[in-house]
Design a protein with these regions (language model features):
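Solvent-exposed helix-loop boundary motif
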Residues: 28-39, 43, 47, 54-132, ...
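Post-cleavage N-terminal segment of exported redox proteins
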Residues: 1-42, 143-153
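Residues within well-ordered alpha-helical secondary structure of globular protein domains
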Residues: 51, 117, 144-148
Length: 153
């Protein structure tokens, strides 16, 4: 292979990589992990996940799980000032024996099952109406918060 052929192949590879990255709908931070500033604390999760909005202004979770002008879906109000008391050690209203958040045990926390769309859930994966599901990075932060004791921090 000549130097010119190798140079041309490198240019084509660089352009192909650029086209793939530019055409991707997901942000690289969504693929790699949580966005900067998102921490495994309740206050960070409540503000940056539960009450966050997309580019169209739709709330990821509080579009349905709010008491503002309505009864919250599943009786679960995820506004930051009330969410903790309605999540931690609270039984699911639809799945007998399931607890929404089991401190120290993300694998047995029903909210994780619902957000990941596991086969044992009642109803649909969440969030169901507001667009994309949570990223792997966001789920990792929620799991870490639960596994470290689900503190109201």
């Amino acid at each position: 292979m000549t130097a010119r052929t190798i140079g041309r192949a490198a240019q084509i590879a660089a352009l192909a990589t650029l086209a793939l990255v530019a055409g991707c709908d997901e942000k690289l931070s969504d693929i790699a992990g949580p966005s900067p500033g998102l921490q495994p604390t309740f206050s960070s999760i409540a503000q940056n996940i539960f009450a966050s909005t997309d580019n169209a202004g739709r709330a990821a979770c509080t579009q349905c799980h709010t008491n503002q002008g309505r009864t919250p879906a599943a009786g679960l109000n995820l506004l930051p000032d009330t969410a903790y008391a309605q999540l931690v050690n609270v039984p699911s209203v639809f799945k007998p024996g399931a607890v929404r958040v089991v401190p120290g045990d993300a694998d047995n926390s029903y909210i994780v099952h619902k957000l990941e769309g596991r086969s044992d859930i009642v109803g649909q994966r969440m969030p169901r109406t507001s667009g994309p599901f949570l990223t792997d990075g966001q789920m990792l932060v929620i799991r870490r918060w639960i596994d470290k004791g689900a503190q109201n921090d």
